[in-house]
């Protein structure tokens, strides 16, 4: 059951509850043969098809970021601490692999090695893009998108950073993890990565 609170068109606070009981992502009748027959979307000889790309979907997430001073002033108990953040870019024609340069940069800023990271949430716009990042950085696939990426769970545009952070924190709590990374590619060759230390 999901509870949604919002301000309606009359300016009054309204709360509604509803049950999410349908996953709109999977399509009935999908088969390996049907997926293999899909045409490439970007280049005639390309590998990216509608079958190995994330669907656009609705989604919402909320993350509140504040200084340590403000946390103390408000007497709050933070869930995680952002250890480092890095943004970088690659050639726009190879859009999708920005995390290949952003993740090492964030690790260096944090003074951490890749093998100290327990979990990674990597945005998965396309399977080929995610696989390229995993391969280029020699990431352990057992700690990347452990509950599925955007192809399985959806890709709500404009919500990626918050959504992946919330997913990371939930899984870090379950596994008693210390360090995790949220990383994503951004259009025109950009990449971003944030390293978090779980505090709960």
Describe each model-derived feature in a short phrase:
Residues 70, 84-90, 123-128, 148-152, ...:
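Acidic, glycine-rich active-site loops and adjacent beta-strand->loop/helix elements
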Residues 4-11, 92-99, 124-142, 156-160, ...:
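Short glycine/threonine-rich loop-to-helix capping motif typified by GTGT followed
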Residues 4, 39-42, 86, 107-110, ...:
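Structural signal for hydrophobic packing residues in well-ordered secondary-structure cores
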Residues 45-61, 83-109, 118, 122-124, ...:
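Active-site pocket-shaping loop/turn-to-helix segments
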Residues 1, 76-87, 114-124, 143-149, ...:
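Beta-strand segments within the central parallel beta-sheet cores of soluble alpha/beta enzyme folds
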Residues 1-73, 136, 141-143:
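N-terminal extracellular/periplasmic Venus flytrap/periplasmic-binding protein-like
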Residues 71-75, 104-119, 137-138:
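Phosphate/pyrophosphate-binding loops at sites that engage ATP/ADP/AMP, CoA/4′-phosphopantetheine
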């Amino acid at each position: 059951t999901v509870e949604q609170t919002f301000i309606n068109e009359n300016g009054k606070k309204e709360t509604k509850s509803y049950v999410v009981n349908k996953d709109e992502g999977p399509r009935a009748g999908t088969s390996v043969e049907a997926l293999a027959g899909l045409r490439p979307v970007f280049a005639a000889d390309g590998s990216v098809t509608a079958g190995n790309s994330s669907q656009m979907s609705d989604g919402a997430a909320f993350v509140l970021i504040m200084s340590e001073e403000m946390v103390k002033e408000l007497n709050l108990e933070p869930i995680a601490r952002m250890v480092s953040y890095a943004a970088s870019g690659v050639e726009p024609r190879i859009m999708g692999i920005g995390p290949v340069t952003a993740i090492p940069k964030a690790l260096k800023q944090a003074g951490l090695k890749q093998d100290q990271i327990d979990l990674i949430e990597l945005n998965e716009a396309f399977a080929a893009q995610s696989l390229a990042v995993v391969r280029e950085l020699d990431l352990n696939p057992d700690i990347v998108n452990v509950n599925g990426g955007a192809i399985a769970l959806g890709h709500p545009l404009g919500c990626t950073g918050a959504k992946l952070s919330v997913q990371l924190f939930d899984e870090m709590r379950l596994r008693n993890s210390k360090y995790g990374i949220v990383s994503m590619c951004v259009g025109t060759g950009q990449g971003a990565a944030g390293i978090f230390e779980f505090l709960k």
